[in-house]
């Protein structure tokens, strides 16, 4: 048995912070998948023992794929699924051709974890419904559920783990991504630097806006509440941002920017 699949990054068309609850921030966001040259390729096959290969920047225990697999196994045990199915997950060789950077606001680790959970559910005929997969995904990381969903465009609420499909003409082939070299944004550090000025009360209106309208009527600072704190924590990022044209927007907590492909700007 060998299965291979591709996973793609996301960008946040908008990301608005509502308020802080405990250690984390409640937010609303529109996530869009971007299908281009930037992608990870994951292969899964049977092996004598578990093996995870890839150009990762963290210890195994912190790897999102490893975490997703452990949480999935515990969930299946709680459902009292066949022991042979759970045992087969212990003898997988997973190899990742890693191209999507982490700490870039593109869902680098969550992309792989969400894709793996979605495909393992199909490969092993686990028959988990979307809500069950979301329960697992939310324990892996906030962005994971967007990648489990396989939606091309979705609203994310709560801490980013509550996903709802947003019906619109997909932008997946109309966006291009720019990732600055050697700038890595810690999500935790950027959120810690965030200082709310006023409470945000327009969540419902924003969640109804088509993504294209957002990009055509708002600037990057207005669309993403994390841009300013990211620039405060990274002088090199601030230098780059100051040289970018208005057509560039900021994704997540950074460091990546994105825009509508210039050749297609006037197509609608």
From Swiss-Prot:
Q: Where is the active site?
A: 10, 143
Note one Pfam family from the annotation. Answer: GHMP_kinases_N
Q: Which residues bind ATP?
A: 101-111
Kindly report, in one word, the top-level EC class recorded for this enzyme: transferase
The pathway entry for this protein reads as: Isoprenoid biosynthesis; isopentenyl diphosphate biosynthesis via DXP pathway; isopentenyl diphosphate from 1-deoxy-D-xylulose 5-phosphate: step 3/6
GO BP annotation list = isopentenyl diphosphate biosynthetic process, methylerythritol 4-phosphate pathway; terpenoid biosynthetic process
Which GO molecular function terms does the record list? 4-(cytidine 5'-diphospho)-2-C-methyl-D-erythritol kinase activity; ATP binding
Function statement: Catalyzes the phosphorylation of the position 2 hydroxy group of 4-diphosphocytidyl-2C-methyl-D-erythritol.
User: Which HAMAP family does the record associate with it?
Assistant: IspE
Identify this protein by name.
Answer: 4-diphosphocytidyl-2-C-methyl-D-erythritol kinase
- This protein's species is Helicobacter acinonychis (strain Sheeba)
């Amino acid at each position: 048995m060998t299965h291979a699949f591709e996973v793609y990054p996301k960008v946040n068309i908008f990301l608005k912070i509502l308020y802080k609850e405990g250690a984390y921030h409640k937010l609303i966001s529109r996530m869009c998948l971007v299908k281009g040259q930037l992608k990870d390729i994951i292969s899964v096959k049977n092996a004598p023992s578990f093996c995870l290969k890839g150009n990762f920047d963290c210890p195994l225990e912190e790897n999102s794929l490893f975490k997703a697999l452990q949480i999935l196994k515990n969930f299946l045990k709680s459902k009292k699924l066949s022991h042979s199915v759970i045992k087969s997950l212990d003898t997988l060789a997973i190899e990742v051709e890693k191209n999507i950077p982490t700490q870039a606001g593109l869902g680098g680790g969550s992309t792989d974890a969400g894709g793996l959970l979605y495909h393992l559910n199909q490969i092993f005929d686990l028959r988990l419904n979307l809500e069950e997969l979301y329960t697992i995904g939310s324990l892996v990381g906030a962005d994971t559920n967007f990648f489990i969903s396989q939606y091309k465009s979705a609203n994310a609420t709560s801490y980013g783990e509550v996903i709802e499909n947003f019906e619109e003409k997909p932008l997946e082939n109309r966006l291009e991504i720019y990732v600055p070299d050697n700038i890595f944004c810690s999500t935790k550090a950027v959120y810690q630097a965030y200082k709310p000025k006023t409470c945000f009360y327009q969540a419902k209106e924003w969640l109804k806006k088509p993504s294209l309208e957002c990009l055509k009527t708002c600037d990057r600072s207005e669309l993403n509440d994390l841009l300013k704190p990211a620039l405060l924590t990274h002088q090199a990022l601030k230098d780059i941002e100051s040289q970018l044209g208005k057509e560039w927007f900021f994704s997540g907590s950074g460091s990546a920017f994105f825009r509508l492909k210039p050749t297609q700007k006037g197509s609608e």
